[in-house]
Amino acid sequence: MAKQIIFGEKVRVSLKKGVDTLANTVRVTLGPKGHPVALERKWGAPTVIDDGVTIARDIELPDAFENMGAQLVKEAATRTSDAAGDGTTTSIVLAQAIINEAFKNIAAGAEPINLKRGIEKAVAALKAQLRKNSTPVKGKQQIVQVATITGKDPEIGNLIADVMDKVGKDGVITIEESRGLRYETSYVEGMQFDRGYISAYFVTDPGRMESVMEDATILMTDRKIETVAELLPALEKILQISKNLVIVAENVEAEALATLVVNKLRGNLNILAVKAPGYGDRQKAMLEDMAILTGGHVISKEAGRKLDSVTEADLGHARRIVSNKDKTTIIDGEGSAEAIKDRIKQIKAQIEETESAFDREKLQERQAALVGGVAVIAVGAATETEMKERKARVEDALAATRAAIEEGILPGGGTGLLNALPCLDALKLEGDEATGVNIVRKALIEPVRWIATNAGKDGNVIVDKVKNSPVGHGYNAENDVFGDMAEMGIIDPTMVVRSALENAASIANMVLITDSLVADIQEKAPAAPGPEAAGMY
């Protein structure tokens, strides 16, 4: 296909238009008084949502060059969401501010590479300062505060805190849709392991890049499956029993994987293939744990069994299995409670006997997986649109809470970034590198400015007041007051703030040093033939 190419100033104009279109759409959601955005759906009612990354993912622009700018900023939000689960809108706002200010300086003669170096040095100093300013999460009340701010609902904050209190900070928590009208929590047998789907073609929820299997039948083996010949006899037997199959194997590759993917895409099979966790003897033990939890048996090389020997009794069962690229969660396995208790006792005995600290740690992880179970938060609402919006907020709140526990917290509402600003004064740079630092300095006020603007206030006035306030003091947009953000319960996870800044700067740097764009020339579809004239054949 023929290409169209643009250079220089035209590149910056197109990229800026794309960046601004996406950022202007998303930034209205920032803060407690931000406004939701309605997303059109091919079928049914539009989705009304205030989650930055979900909105960004839905945006495609008709102009190819402008769309490149939008997609690059979308990448900043996606990376932030993957790393911290929240802060996606902040990341987009920061990226837009850095890009627009950098383009002004490039138009005035600044060298993009030197601006990039200055921006990188400023961000490195800010990240170190953010970690220095961070404080650990103390007690259940701060967990409530973090989850409430991200979920924009005190009920969500209390819900997350209660569930974490029961399953522990590292416990497995899953979020499901419910037919009810409110939030419900339950605790079921289950486990999670750090292996995801083998191929992205198994994804059933493209928005979250997850494969979800309801009423799953599970085939577990420590074998590597490579050919259709070894897989087909087992599949024919299993599909007479269940249409929802999850294969957990050492690996599924080559011809066997291609066959599963093709049949999945054609709708012939509802299937998910996942790599077995661990290696060697530990893999065998973890597969055995899984078999006991789900009421099945492992098709094991040691026992001399092949896949074609599988019987109905070998298959495990679970109410639900959720898998992404990194981990898989088995929820409500149908294994015998007595068998699970016996397995836990066996692992406890091994923990007491082992002299290896490493082995003890791995055994304790296995024990925790069997003992802890899985907490399930079921999200209900009066309509499907409201339910999906609520579910997204609960997911964000859970991710932000985990981030806060991992890296600590900072004053919220954009105050954490403003408090870190003085560290930039110590950077003694010259020329365009110093300009790069000033670009970041100007960008850091934008989150506070937009939180205030979305609350109906003059953003610049609010920024000036926050800058002149004591460290840790900021603007509470919910109640329209200034004060100590921590005391008011307005806190942000350090990981969220750091990731938002880091990813915004990274994407902005890519945009500002780009000097040519290449895109396909879209061929116009041929016009439909008109009706034939009367009397002609």
UniProtKB/Swiss-Prot annotation:
Cellular component terms (Gene Ontology): cytoplasm
Pfam families in the record: Cpn60_TCP1 (PF00118)
Residue spans crossing the bilayer: none
Predominant subcellular localization, coarse grouping: cytoplasm
EC number(s) reported in the record: 5.6.1.7
Binding site for ATP: T29, L30, G31, P32, D86, G87, T88, T89, T90, G413, D492
A GO molecular-function annotation: ATP binding
Keywords linked to the UniProt accession: ATP-binding, Chaperone, Cytoplasm, Isomerase, Nucleotide-binding
Family annotation (CDD domains): GroEL (cd03344)
Catalytic activity: ATP + H2O + a folded polypeptide = ADP + phosphate + an unfolded polypeptide
Subcellular location per the Swiss-Prot or TrEMBL entry: Cytoplasm
Signal sequence interval, chain numbering: none
Gene Ontology terms describing biological process: protein refolding
PANTHER family xref list: 60 KDA HEAT SHOCK PROTEIN, MITOCHONDRIAL
Subunit structure: Forms a cylinder of 14 subunits composed of two heptameric rings stacked back-to-back. Interacts with the co-chaperonin GroES.
Sequence similarity: Belongs to the chaperonin (HSP60) family.
Function: Together with its co-chaperonin GroES, plays an essential role in assisting protein folding. The GroEL-GroES system forms a nano-cage that allows encapsulation of the non-native substrate proteins and provides a physical environment optimized to promote and accelerate protein folding.
UniProt protein name: Chaperonin GroEL
Biological source species: Dehalococcoides mccartyi (strain CBDB1)
Gene from which this protein is expressed: groEL
